[in-house]
Amino acid sequence: MKHNSLKFLFIAASISIGLSSCDGYLDQMPSNALPSDESINNIEDVGSALNGVYSGLLSSEYYGADFISRAEVGGEDVQTSTPSKRTENFYKFMYRQNNAPTGLWKIPYQVINRVNVLLQAIESGKITASPQLDNAKGEALAVRALCNFNLNIVYGYPYQKDKGASLGAPIVEKVLTANDMPARNTVAEGYEAIEKDLTTALGLVSDKVNDGHFNKWAVLGLQARVYLYKGNYDAAFNCAETIIKESPYKLIQNADYLAAWSNEYTSESVSYTHLTLPTIA
């Protein structure tokens, strides 16, 4: 009997040790990844992270297709061919539990999280201050404003319906954990956050042309659009007029219009994204 008791005690102790070892083993970070707070340590890392921010905009569930086609086929500009797996639900407005387009919510928040990881690293003080770093921070803030703007367009009533009193999308300005469940903010709160990010970005970004990236003129262009949706027409006009009068961008002349389509960027390309992103300037 004593022998059996010792045997059971030994087995129980072995299980306990095994479970403790297992816990430690399962807590290990993957060998092919870094924690977000350790992955951005210098200006080169900042450039790579910023390119990752922009690449998220190009998802087929965002600017790569769905965000554009949703508006086009939802109005009267474009009629979808049937059957069309990508645009038919938008065109017919046939949203069910098993086919509702979740990407228009998921992808912008993925991009926002990338922005917040980058901003957390920049604001930690561990990266040497420089104009490059300021510019990268400004670009990241502008992208976050763009994503928040789009989320409120899709998931909130137009601002002018009730001065933004109705619910829109949650404002996320920090790196989230798996347990975080931010509540929806009002549309007015969303616009306030958008305008704050754009105002800060405007004081940080360069005024030089860097195709595929936000600069001063692209931020002003987004500000103009935000003010237009908000009904602040004087402010929208002022932003647009500044771009027209002071920026290096010019309208293409009639004689050059057809040839311009053979180029990825033109003198009119104030705010564009592209598939192969250059490093930050």
Residue positions per predicted region:
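Sec-dependent bacterial lipoprotein signal peptides
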Residues: M1-S20
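Short coil/linker segments at helix-helix boundaries
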Residues: V154-A188, E192
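Membrane-proximal, proline-rich intrinsically disordered regions
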Residues: C22-S69
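Conserved small/polar residues in nucleotide/adenosyl-binding loops
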Residues: T273-T279
